[in-house]
């Protein structure tokens, strides 16, 4: 497989992870992201031993697709939610 994988870790405000995920699902942004050109996968995961962290595994055909994704209008929904619930964001990208 050729492509770009991005592993994102959010440090959440204490006790807000479930509320953040509920709002992400309700606003429909996941479906919009998954329909973007070049998106091969976009999934949330929980670290087993860190209740205030949330991880995203993004899979893209090309790194350029992931960069374009950040400027999509529906990403404004995520930015608003992150401002309410997320303290810090760490990212690690891998070209494969």
What are the functions of these language-model segments?
Residues 16-40, 74-77:
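Short amphipathic alpha-helical segments
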Residues 23, 45, 69-72, 81:
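Residue-level signal for well-ordered alpha-helical positions
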Residues 2-5, 40-52, 77-96:
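Glycine-rich beta-strand-turn "strand-cap" elements at beta-sheet edges
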Residues 4-11, 41-70:
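Short, well-ordered beta-strand segments in beta-rich or mixed alpha/beta enzyme
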Residues 13, 71-74, 87:
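Charged, amphipathic alpha-helical interaction segments
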Residues 2-17, 22:
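Short, structured interface segments that constitute the first stable element of a domain
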């Amino acid at each position: 497989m050729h492509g770009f994988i991005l592993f994102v870790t959010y440090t959440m405000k204490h006790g807000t992870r479930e509320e953040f995920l509920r709002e992400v699902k309700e606003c429909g942004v996941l479906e919009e992201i998954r329909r973007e050109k070049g998106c091969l996968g976009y999934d949330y995961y929980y670290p087993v031993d860190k209740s205030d962290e949330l991880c995203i595994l993004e899979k893209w055909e090309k790194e350029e697709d992931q960069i374009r994704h950040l400027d999509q209008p529906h990403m404004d929904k995520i930015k608003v939610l992150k401002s309410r619930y997320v303290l810090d964001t760490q990212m690690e990208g891998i070209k494969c």
